[in-house]
Curated annotation (Swiss-Prot):
It catalyses: NAD(+) + (deoxyribonucleotide)n-3'-hydroxyl + 5'-phospho-(deoxyribonucleotide)m = (deoxyribonucleotide)n+m + AMP + beta-nicotinamide D-nucleotide. It comes from Caulobacter vibrioides (strain NA1000 / CB15N). Its cofactor is Mg(2+); Mn(2+). One of its GO terms (molecular function) is DNA ligase (NAD+) activity. Belongs to the NAD-dependent DNA ligase family. LigA subfamily. This is DNA ligase. Keywords: DNA damage, DNA repair, DNA replication, Ligase, Magnesium, Manganese, Metal-binding, NAD, Zinc. Residues 705-783 form the BRCT domain. The keyword Secreted does not apply. InterPro entries: BRCT_dom (IPR001357), BRCT_dom_sf (IPR036420), DNA_ligase (IPR001679), DNA_ligase_AS (IPR018239), DNA_ligase_CS (IPR033136), DNAligase_adenylation (IPR013839), DNAligase_N (IPR013840), NA-bd_OB-fold (IPR012340).
Length: 783
């Protein structure tokens, strides 16, 4: 994704950014909502969402059907039954400054035509950092509970929610509607969270990164008995479907919810007037925040009058009558006691700050990320310094600055990044040089498979949930088996399951016994039969993620065929000179082909010797190049001779057909193709794979059908789908052999339009493309 300011983006760059933002935010949504394991901080996530919205605002005709601005949460997990919400559970727009809070008040007034001199009342509620839930009551009795899911369809977690003491099984008092969906937040108090993590760590069990993850993971347990053992709490402060009105204002509704047995919020919501009231209450909640005993990440402002809420209505995925004013990330000062280096499975070295324990937002922090050596140098952070750390609530805290006023005297020496890996082999570290000649910020251990730290990380990746997901083989057990030499590569895991001698030794060990060993063997044997997509992902090759693994598995009938294609591609990889030319600004695939073609003759004659204008010469030598490309090439090479030699060298280093075929697979591309080829080019990788394949029954994944009414066609879904989610529609179409696109073009074969279809429907009509309703689509694919 580009870092070009939105105001400077071309339309082509905007299309590319929106596509990458959609994929990136979808990945983060799944990590946050389904896996309870966020991968970025709230601030980083909000920045991505804001860039997406800014681009869409500047280019409204480029809004994608799968735009993050149209999405709430994530699709439900398959292990829970679906629950369709009577009224969608929408998210809120965010405000990050006083100016944006004031603008919210101004927007409300403009829409309702209320003058600045008139009063508008708001309720201000603390924004609880937990997991949203909806409770359906019929005649006062709790009949169903669900998570938010994607906002329209959530997960049925009724039995789990019944275990929370704050949730009444029967409403108190009287006057409640016959049917009401009460909505709120499941959360965990900080003290209870700390106590659970401490006990789990002592028992060698999984700990959680923060209270929000803990609450989500605890509620979304298959066994409600586990949820019952967790210290979950619930605040109820909103509603969805109701059979009849029960209040005239947000404030009155909170009072009724409290009468019926719900804890609304603590500290209690407050009613404020006009824009200044919004700012004042925000300041009050910010002061209270560290004292609450649970996490809040902002204040929610809602127009108090429910009739005004009705008139304001909704826009896209959020109400016009409410907004969340987010708090900045929490900060604290502490002492940097050491800098340790962690080694990833691909050899990437990540420096981690070891800190004197400090409490930030109620959570004890002892580690913080330093990202890379360049970041350490930029901050000039030194061991012994007092540093300012920032905790965004979701990921490992980071050091944001050094408190120079507190630097010891004499000052500690500047940190020198080690030149060798911290593993016992102490192999040298290296910084890769990109094709454009720039040095990577990441240092890597050059020991590769010989490095024991990398080997352990490879094994951890192999048994991870989205790879082989072997029950009973956690990180501690894996580390112990590696240190003993029992498991040094993936195939050893399956050999262990039938090694009677080792299993007998294991049964006698403390913490194992007959049952534990039996469960371990059962978990291993259950994964001897594995899908080809999981097999590919489990290998841990660089740049080969889950999505690419699935694409590869669908394009090859057997794993052996994939390996043969990758080995052939390794013999046809592009050379460095070709890659260098391909990274020149403005040089896209077509321009690259023209330049390489010009260099194939072995000599590129100077077309205009009488001038020194290199850009002009390049334009004559390769006439169809764009002006930006000519300028970039002139700047890169400097002289005609250097340019001509570069073309000849690039042509000689052009990739062969075997590589091009692999890279041309839709969803693979050059980066993944090169990484996969280089993985299988290594002798030790091929041996490791051969050992593993001998232990497994690798199953092909389901291929898209080719004999359906839509096979080979390009489909676009637009508008609201009422009988399935957009993800379900996409999966259905792809399973039937169709390709699903996000925008309508001359290449589109069919548009499925639901209510609210806009510009895509108009474009399809203008182009004469077939359009059908959702019901017609379902009838078509059923036949």
């Amino acid at each position: 994704m580009s870092q070009i300011p939105v105001a400077d983006l071309t339309e082509a760059q905007a299309v590319e950014d929106l596509e990458r933002l959609a994929d990136l935010l979808a990945t983060h949504d799944i990590a946050y909502h389904q896996e309870d394991n966020p991968t970025v901080s709230d601030a980083e996530y909000d920045a991505l969402k804001r860039r997406n919205l800014d681009i869409e605002t500047r280019f409204p005709h480029l809004v994608r059907d799968n735009s993050p601005s149209m999405r709430v949460g994530a699709t439900r997990a398959e292990q829970f039954a679906p629950v369709e919400h009577g009224v969608p559970m929408l998210s809120l727009d965010n405000a990050f400054s006083n100016d944006e809070a004031i603008e919210f008040d101004a927007r409300v007034r403009r829409f309702l035509r209320i003058s600045p001199s008139e009063t508008v009342a708001y309720t201000a509620e603390p924004k609880i950092d937990g997991l949203s839930a909806s409770l359906r009551y019929e005649k006062g009795v709790l009949v169903q509970g669900a998570t938010r899911g994607d906002g329209r369809v959530g997960e049925d977690v009724t039995a789990n929610l019944r275990t929370i003491a704050d949730i009444p099984h029967r409403l108190k008092g009287s006057g409640w509607p016959d049917v009401i969906e009460v909505r709120g937040e499941v959360y965990v108090e900080l003290a209870a969270f700390a106590a659970f993590n401490k006990a789990a760590e002592e028992a060698g069990q999984r700990t959680y990164a923060n209270p929000r993850n803990f609450a989500a993971g605890s509620l979304r347990q298959i066994d409600p008995k586990i949820s019952a053992q967790r210290p979950l709490r619930f605040f109820g402060y909103a509603w969805g479907l109701v059979s009849e009105g029960f209040a005239d204002s947000q404030w009155g509704a909170l009072e009724r919810l409290a009468e019926w047995g719900f804890v609304t919020t603590a500290p209690p919501a407050q009613r404020v007037l006009n824009a200044q009231g919004l700012l004042d209450i925000y300041a009050q909640f910010e002061v209270l925040r560290p004292t609450l005993g649970f996490d809040i990440d902002g204040v929610v402002y809602k127009v108090d009058d429910l009739e005004l809420q009705r008139r304001l209505g909704f826009v896209s995925r959020s109400p016009r009558w409410a907004i969340a004013r987010k708090f900045p990330a929490q900060r604290a000062r502490t002492v940097l006691e050491a800098i340790d280096l962690q080694v990833g499975r691909t050899g990437a070295i990540t420096p981690v700050a070891r800190l004197k324990p400090v409490t930030v937002g109620g959570v004890s922090v002892t580690n913080a990320t330093l990202h890379n050596g360049d970041e350490i140098a930029r901050l000039d952070v030194r061991v012994g310094d007092t540093v300012v750390i920032q905790r965004a609530g979701d990921v490992i805290p980071q050091i944001v600055e050094v408190a120079l006023d507190a630097r010891p005297d004499p000052a500690p020496p500047p940190y020198e990044f080690p030149h060798v890996c911290p593993c016992p082999l102490q192999t040298p570290l290296a910084r890769e040089v990109t094709a454009s000649g720039q040095e990577s910020v990441v240092r890597r251990c050059t020991g590769e498979f010989a490095c024991p730290f990398q080997r352990v990380e490879h094994l951890r990746h192999f048994v991870s949930r989205r790879a082989f997901d072997i029950e009973g083989l956690g990180e501690k057990q894996l580390q112990a088996f590696f240190e003993e030499g029992w498991i040094t590569e993936p195939a050893d895991i399956f050999k262990l399951a039938r090694d009677a001698e080792k299993l007998a030794v294991l049964r006698e060990r403390e913490g194992y016994g007959e049952t534990s060993v039996a469960n371990l063997v059962k978990g291993i044997e259950a994964r001897r039969t594995i899908g080809m997509d999981r097999m590919i992902y489990g290998l841990g090759a660089r740049d080969i993620g889950e999505t690419t693994s699935t694409v590869l598995a669908r394009n090859f009938d057997r794993f052996e065929d994939l390996q043969a294609a990758a080995e052939a591609a390794a013999r046809a990889l592009p050379g460095e000179t070709y890659l260098e030319l391909s990274t020149a600004p403005g040089v896209g695939p077509k321009a690259l082909d023209m330049l390489v073609e010009a260099g194939k003759g072995g000599v590129v004659a100077d077309p205009w010797p009488q001038t020194d204008d290199l850009e002009l010469k390049i334009g004559h030598a390769v006439p169809k190049l764009t002006k930006p490309a000519r300028a970039a090439l002139a700047q890169r090479y400097g002289t005609w001779d250097a340019f001509a030699d570069g073309l000849v060298a690039a042509a000689s280093g052009a990739p062969g057909d075997d590589y091009l075929h692999l890279a041309a697979i839709d969803g693979v591309g050059p980066v993944a193709a090169q990484s996969l080829a280089r993985f299988f080019a290594e002798d030790h990788n091929r041996q490791k794979v051969a050992n593993l394949v001998a232990e497994l029954d690798i199953q092909p994944v389901a291929k898209p059908k080719t004999d359906t009414a839509v096979a080979g066609k390009t489909i676009v879904f637009t508008g609201s789908l009422e009988k399935m989610t957009r993800d379900e529609a996409k999966a259905q179409a792809e399973g039937l052999g169709a390709k699903v696109a996000s925008s309508v073009s001359k290449k589109t074969d069919l548009v499925v339009a639901g209510p609210g279809a806009g510009s895509k429907l108009k474009t399809a009509t203008d182009l004469g493309i077939q359009v059908m309703t959702e019901d017609e689509w379902l009838e078509l694919v059923a036949g």
